[in-house]
């Protein structure tokens, strides 16, 4: 057995004058760490006070063409869900959950697949100051992501908001 161990060590030992390759961590320089996002709570409804937080706007800014496009999409439908996949074939559990909630409330809604367009996906993150998907818009305003939608559904706030939107 000792001979086997010696043979395996010899098999991985470098040739005389050669050195073992450096580990990847020694070859790849570390990227500078980005500062963590700053979160601020918005005030307003009970939903906003208890669960909704918005990322503080970072630098860069949204291209005017993208802002105009998103304004048009969000403003032209009472309920819009930006999601991963489609309402008939959601590509993530969070998107599926919000679709199921909206269907259970028998609300007409439009969906846009953010996986089909990288520029749309990145633009929406800036537009809403919300980093994840799905993103639900009701009556032209950002309502929230999956967790906020679920909480609002359980409390009855989502139903109230949707009823008001459908009547306006």
UniProtKB/Swiss-Prot annotation:
Residues 67-168 form the Glutaredoxin domain. One of its GO terms (molecular function) is metal ion binding. One of its GO terms (cellular component) is chloroplast. The keyword GTP-binding does not apply. Its main location: plastid. The keyword Transmembrane helix does not apply. InterPro entries: Glutaredoxin (IPR002109), GRX_PICOT-like (IPR033658), Monothiol_GRX-rel (IPR004480), Thioredoxin-like_sf (IPR036249). Keywords: 2Fe-2S, Chloroplast, Iron, Iron-sulfur, Metal-binding, Plastid, Redox-active center, Transit peptide. Transmembrane segments: none annotated. It is found in: Plastid, Chloroplast. Residues 1-54 form a transit peptide. [2Fe-2S] cluster binds at residue 92. Glutathione binds at residues 84, 121, 133, 146-147. Belongs to the glutaredoxin family. CGFS subfamily. May only reduce GSH-thiol disulfides, but not protein disulfides. This is Monothiol glutaredoxin-S7, chloroplastic. It comes from Oryza sativa subsp. japonica. The gene is GRXS7.
């Amino acid at each position: 057995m000792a001979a086997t161990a010696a043979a395996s060590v010899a098999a991985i030992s470098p040739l005389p004058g050669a050195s073992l390759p450096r580990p990847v961590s020694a070859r790849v320089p570390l990227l500078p760490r980005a500062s963590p996002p700053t979160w601020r709570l918005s005030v307003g409804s009970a939903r906003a006070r208890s669960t909704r937080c918005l990322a503080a706007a970072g630098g860069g800014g949204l291209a005017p063409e993208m802002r105009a496009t998103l304004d048009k999409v969000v403003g032209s439908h009472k309920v819009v869900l930006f999601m991963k996949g489609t309402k008939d074939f959601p590509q993530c559990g969070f998107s599926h959950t919000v679709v199921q909630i909206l269907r259970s409330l028998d609300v007409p809604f439009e969906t846009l697949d953010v996986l089909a367009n990288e520029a749309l996906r990145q633009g929406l993150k800036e537009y809403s100051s919300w980093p994840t998907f799905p993103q639900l818009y009701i009556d032209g305003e950002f309502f929230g992501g999956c967790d906020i939608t679920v909480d609002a559904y359980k409390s009855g706030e989502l139903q109230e908001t949707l009823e008001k939107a459908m009547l306006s």
